[in-house]
Amino acid sequence: MSDMKKVTLVLSDGTKFHGKSFGYDAPVAGEVVFNTAMMGYPESLTDPSYAGQLMTLTFPLVGNYGVPPFTFEENGLPTFMESDKIYASAIIVNDYSEQYSHWNAVESLADWLKREKVPGITGIDTRELTKVLREHGVMMGKILFDDEPDNIPEANYEGVNFVDQVSCKEIIRYNEGAGKKVVLVDCGVKANIIRCLINRGVEVIRVPWNYDYTDMDFDGLFLANGPGDPDMCEDAVNIIRKQISQSRKPICGICMGNQLLSKAAGATIYKLKYGHRSHNQPVRMVGTNNCYITSQNHGYAVDAKTLGNDWEELFVNMNDGSNEGIRHKVNPWFSSQFHPEACSGPVDTEFMFDKFVETLKSVSYTHLTLPTIL
């Protein structure tokens, strides 16, 4: 790939990093974030939560195991990806591996990016870039080609509802007739979340983020992950409030789902300085010494001090003390800021799905006693 074009990553504070293009040759602007995971770039790139972001990978070697095929299971879910396309606006790496080797790979990362028209740049000192973002916070940035004029505006995400952009537009059903019915609010759901529910023998009814499901026939509510600012999702919050005011049906949330449930519980949300995007975030279950290693991808957090009196923290981040989950003190409503479905990452907390489905099948709803795996 000696014909790679020279590019410059320009941060909003003027800091510049020089590299070369190995993906689609087009300038792009977006929010520059970093992910410290050592693997999982196919899953991360197709995670709708990365919509609008220039994803920096701190692990130096990227692309050496190629890209798996875009095949689909009988239930319609992609076999190896988290959605049906790339959602990240670009990928930034230190050392792109042109040669790849993996039993399941069908193409290179470069070929995939070009086919989906997503820029990728290599030769960047990604650890130095990460230090800049760590000290100054995430910033907007642009990837510019050195031989072309800067003719794209800086990204401005104020007032942008990314959830509306990535959510489904109509109701989709999975595993029909399987048993208990779960309404899943699609804020940008990852495929493996749906798979984890299907594998536990429930029917999943996937609805758009702002769909009023309160009069539907279902047994439990699942609030999925998604990109951007949860304050843009007031319609979803109001529907959740309506649901919890009229029913004690079990509720579980993940990532954005944790934030939306918390907002419905009266809490406020704030933006983290540089977010949590990795496979090695330690969280502690409140009231215990149980610590779990989790996969995370979020830039906002719940201010637990603002939760209503009937709610309490369920998990806390061991690195910075931020909220990692909540639960109601009486009703079977709980959520996690981390991703128990992983994909990619550790599956230490997959018991969250077990507890949710177990609660669906219980005759009476009682205060949750979450199991441990230690």
PLM segments and residue spans:
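Cysteine-nucleophile active-site neighborhood
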Residues: 218, 225-304, 345-355, 359-360
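Catalytic beta-strand/loop cores that center a nucleophilic Ser/Cys/Thr
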Residues: 290-331
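Acidic, glycine-enriched active-site microenvironments
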Residues: 2-13, 17
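A glycine-centered loop/beta-turn motif at secondary-structure junctions
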Residues: 325-361
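Flexible inter-domain linker/hinge segments
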Residues: 133, 138-181
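Conserved small/polar residues in nucleotide/adenosyl-binding loops
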Residues: 366-372
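Phosphate-binding active sites in nucleotide-utilizing proteins
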Residues: 181, 187-238, 242-243
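Feature captures the catalytic cores and cofactor-binding loops of soluble hydro-lyases/lyases
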Residues: 15-17, 21-146
